Regions:
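Beta-rich, blade/repeat-based domains predominating
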Residues: 3-13, 45-56, 87-100, 130-145, ...
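A short beta-strand motif characteristic of beta-propeller blades
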Residues: 1-2, 37-43, 80-87, 123-130, ...
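Short loop/turn segments immediately following beta-strands, especially the blade-tip
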Residues: 31-34, 72-78, 117-121, 161-168, ...
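Short loop/turn segments immediately following the C-termini of beta-strands
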Residues: 21-23, 64-66, 108-110, 153-154, ...
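Loop-centered beta-sheet repeat module
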Residues: 103-156
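Structural signal for beta-propeller blades
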Residues: 24-28, 67-69, 111-113, 156-158, ...
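Blade-level signature of beta-propeller repeat domains, shared across WD40, Kelch, NHL, RCC1
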Residues: 248-252, 266-282
């Protein structure tokens, strides 16, 4: 079995959800893990999605170039298209975050985060606007959805918003890099620990991993090399004792030990060869 353009992957039960392209069209495919066969695919986009995530039997994808968000449902191991949210060509849609009955979509090239109401046919209900060349990329909520933490790609900044329903109030903004060091750099992934005490962020070009403490108020407590070049994505292990980062330009995955008490990265413990890796899941 071969799947072209498999940039992003997620797992639902015994099924892999994989982005794919075929005959100049792109979309997603469902692959049975046991039999290694393609169960179904829908190819409606002109370029491959850059993000895929599932919640229960619903799948959400974001397309950077097409500027669309696609919503699917898995029904009897087949894909059913629920909604295509068309934002704008080259909007830079980079993620879909679930919040109550809303979808939150960072639109990197529009310098906006757009919020859509699931219960009202995915209508646009809120837009957060950022200064030009900020490039909001990925965000995470804390456990009770009272704070939304966002990383920007173009300006390499961290944003902390207080959240009350659809009111997003900016509390803190941190520069991950000095302004004169932004050339040829771009921040990428963001993760939060289960106890909501620490944030981790990767920055390409500078090849950095940044640790932010959320206690009292957000502050940077550590920045170290990612163990390779172009750290596009990373994850925390289930027990949060390790951080695994994929470095695309050096074709490797670096594994770091974490100190759960202070959130800091202790040391690099292993590096494995992984060709052209751009995403990672457990």
């Amino acid at each position: 079995m071969s799947i072209d353009d498999a940039k992003c992957v997620d797992r639902y039960e015994n099924i892999l959800i994989i982005t794919t392209s075929k005959n100049n069209k792109s979309g997603i495919a469902l692959v049975d893990i046991s039999t290694k066969t393609i169960l179904d695919e829908i190819l409606l986009e002109n370029s491959s999605p850059c993000f895929v995530k599932h919640h229960d039997d619903f799948i959400y994808t974001a397309n950077y170039h097409d500027g669309v968000v696609m919503v699917y449902q898995i029904v009897n191991n087949k894909l059913k298209l629920i909604k295509q949210i068309s934002i704008q060509n080259k909007a830079g849609c980079h993620q879909v975050v679930l919040y109550k009955n809303y979808l939150i979509v960072p639109c990197l090239l529009l310098d906006q985060v757009r919020i859509f109401d699931i219960n009202n046919d995915y209508d646009l209900v809120k837009t957060l606007t950022f200064p030009a060349k900020t490039g909001p990329r990925h965000g995470v909520f804390n456990h009770d959805y009272s704070h939304f933490y966002l990383v920007s790609e173009l300006s390499s900044e961290f944003f902390d918003f207080s959240v009350d329903n659809l009111e997003f109030t900016l509390n803190t903004k941190l520069n991950l890099l000095p302004k004169d060091k932004l050339d040829n750099t771009s921040s990428a992934a963001i993760r939060i620990t289960k106890d909501n005490r620490f944030i981790y962020i990767s920055t390409r070009g500078a090849d950095l991993l940044t640790v932010i403490s959320l206690e009292n108020e957000p502050k940077i407590i550590q920045q170290i090399n990612s163990g390779g070049m172009h750290p596009r994505d990373f994850i925390l292990s289930e027990d949060e004792q390790y951080l695994l980062v994929v470095n695309k330009d050096t074709d490797d995955m670096s594994s770091f030990q974490l100190d759960k008490t202070n959130g800091k990265i202790v040391k690099l413990i292993n590096t494995d060869k992984v060709p052209h890796a751009i995403g990672i899941i457990l």
